[in-house]
Each structure stands twice: as structure tokens, then as C-alpha cells.
Amino acid sequence: MTLSDTIMEQLEAVRQASRNIVTLSDQNINKVLEDLAGRITSSAQAILEANRKDLEKMERSNPMYDRLLLDEKRLEGIAADMRNVASLPSPLDITLEERTLSSGLSLRKASVPIGVIGIIYEARPNVTFDVFALCLKSGNATVLKGGSDADHSNRAIAELIHTVLQDHGISPDILYLLPSEREAATIMMEAVGKIDMIIPRGSQQLIDHVRNTAKVPVIETGAGIVHTYVDRDADMEMAKAIVLNAKTRRPSVCNALDTLIIHSDRLGDLAELCRPLSEHQVIIFADKRSYLELLPSYPATLLKHAEPEHYGTEFLSLKMSVKTVDTLDEALSHIATYSSRHSEALITRDNAVKAEFFKRVDAAVVYHNASTAFTDGAQFGLGAEIGISTQKLHARGPMALKELTTYKWMIEGDGQTRPL
């Protein structure tokens, strides 16, 4: 059999298995997730050994290294997320709308699973756990195409999940990890009738490739080109804490700060605002005015002149750009030009500026006086997430349980027929 034949045969098995998930009670699903959470801890050494094999192939300086890395603390966090998903209410069979027509027909619109969800992602083995938990809880089967950089990790995780499913009498076909060959992703993206929806998680290049190649419907979980605008009426102590957190907490994730925009009236505060960043070795690409302001105090090895490409870049590392503006309109224009519509933040005490910013910024998540690091399903109280959708159709922002369902109309009658 060819690779395509093998994959399509397995995808049909996934499709068949997906039809049986709806027969599982929420109680049964929760038991699977709670059992898996316990096994993550007890099987930690096997998972970490597989992860070490992947890490050995990657340079520590690679921005993806931190995303690839698993350790006992991160596995404990994944297990906690698994238990959290189990504790959440089921998103299925929720009545969204209900009415009785003049004909006597009773209509009920209720949430149902999407079916088979495909995920294409890069070197993030934690995604394998997160996606499985969310898809199972929402009644969906899962097809995964992880990055080759994390292949050992993903295979170990999938093997553990399959073992737990079999122990609970559930077909392991509800989770299918595709072969590592690049061709497998193309076969997946063209599997109309087998896969209902594909979600890419990773770089803008990956997302663009999936959007341009897939025949299966796609929901984009976007690269984060994230801005924070420090207004003329900002509290600078607050701004200093927020900027530091947004940039340095986890610089390799999509909600990390990429461009600091500062009002020209507050340029005199820029050196103090950026001082904590230098302690974290953050490289700053500054425009002319901010460069001159930072030059006397910011370490010369960390201060660079900004080039056009430094705006609209998702750095995923300890790098950021600085843009000086004279007005709110100029800040909004810059954001509109370069934003990936992921997360954007404003720091100000001016409520009129806040209202204008909230109204005019086109992004999935818009902040006032808070770090963009909060763009996360768990932080929103949604449990783990599939990703952050930057598009407007079906889902926007953190994609958690509700976003992994669709709906159907159920109509009850008493023999009604429609008149000619």
C-alpha cells in the first residue's frame, strides 16, 4: 500500500470511531481524562526520555527549544490541565435556542460535536495532550500531524493515550497521529469527507501553507504580532511591570510582546521603562527618536536601529521593537498595519482613550492596563485551548470546548405536513 492508501484507510477508521464518541457519557469521558492525568505523572520518565531524544537534535539557541522542552514540572501542569478539563461542564447538548412554530412543530437548536478535527502543529508536544483532552471532552475524534522535531515525544504521548483508551473500552482510533513524512500533512489537508476541520498551530509560514493548500475547512490560530501602546496618560510604574511581563515571562509564545508603542510625550520615561528589560538581555530595535532616548542608558550591545522588517515580526525570543507616535490615531494606524489581530494592549488612565482603543482595534483580544500574557484559554477560565483563533468566522480568541462544537436543529412534530 502507498502512504496515501495507508493514511486514508486509517482516516476512515477514525471517522467510524468518531460516531461512537457521542454514545459516551460525560462521566465516562471524565474518568478517561482523570486516569490519563494520573498516568502522565506515573509515566513521566518514559515521556521525558522520548523528549530528550528530540531535544538532542535541536540547538538550545533555537526559539523552538523552549516549546519542545518537557520536564516534570511541565508534565505536572499538563496533568492539572487534564483534570481541569474533566471538571468543566460538558459543552454538548446545550440548548441554544428553542421555539414552537404556528404549525405546532417544536424546534430545538443544540450543541453537537464537529466530528473529526485535524491539528497541524510544530514542536510543541504539550499540544498533543491538550488537543486530545479538549476534543474528547467535546465529543470529537482527533487527527494529529506534529512537527518532526517532536516526533519521539508525540509518539510516546500517543502510545500512552491509546493505552488509557483501551483500558476504558474505547477505540484508540479516536486519536490518530500521522506518520512523520511531510507528504502526510498534504494527504490530511485534502481528506475531504474524512476530516471536518483543520486547525494549524505554529508559525505564520505554516498557517499560510495550510490555508493555501487545504481542501478541508481551516480555522487559523494565528501567529501573534503583539503590540502594547503606552499612552501619554499612562501610569509608568504600571507600564514598566506590564511590558516586562509581556515580553519576558515566556518570550517564545504567541501572546508575548513584539512591539512597544510609546507616545512622544512620554519618551523621557522610556529609559526607565526599558531598564528591567536589559536585565533580561532583551534586544531592542528602536526607531530614531526612541533610539536617541535609550542610547545613554541601554546597553549598547542590546540596542539596535529598527529596520522596516522589525515591525510586523513575531520575534518569539528576547527581542522587541519600539515605535514612537505623536497621537492615538498614529498608534492605531500602526497597529492596524502590522497587527496579526491576536492580542493588543493599551496602558492609560484616560477613559476616553480606552474607549477609542477598544472600539477601533481589530483583534481577538484587546487589553487595557494588563499584560497580553493573559491570552490563554486556562487564564480565561476555559480550560486548556486548541489555540488562539485570529479569524472572525466560527471562533475568535481562545478556542476551548465551546468552539469545538457546532449545532443542529431537532424538530418534533405530531404528524404535521407542509401545505402545497
Swiss-Prot record:
Its main location: cytoplasm. Pathway: Amino-acid biosynthesis; L-proline biosynthesis; L-glutamate 5-semialdehyde from L-glutamate: step 2/2. GO terms for molecular function: glutamate-5-semialdehyde dehydrogenase activity; NADP binding. Catalyzes the NADPH-dependent reduction of L-glutamate 5-phosphate into L-glutamate 5-semialdehyde and phosphate. The product spontaneously undergoes cyclization to form 1-pyrroline-5-carboxylate. It comes from Chlorobium luteolum (strain DSM 273 / BCRC 81028 / 2530) (Pelodictyon luteolum). SUPFAM superfamilies: ALDH-like. GO terms for biological process: L-proline biosynthetic process. It is found in: Cytoplasm. Keywords: Amino-acid biosynthesis, Cytoplasm, NADP, Oxidoreductase, Proline biosynthesis. This is Gamma-glutamyl phosphate reductase. Its EC number is 1.2.1.41. It catalyses: L-glutamate 5-semialdehyde + phosphate + NADP(+) = L-glutamyl 5-phosphate + NADPH + H(+). It comes from the Bacteria. Belongs to the gamma-glutamyl phosphate reductase family.
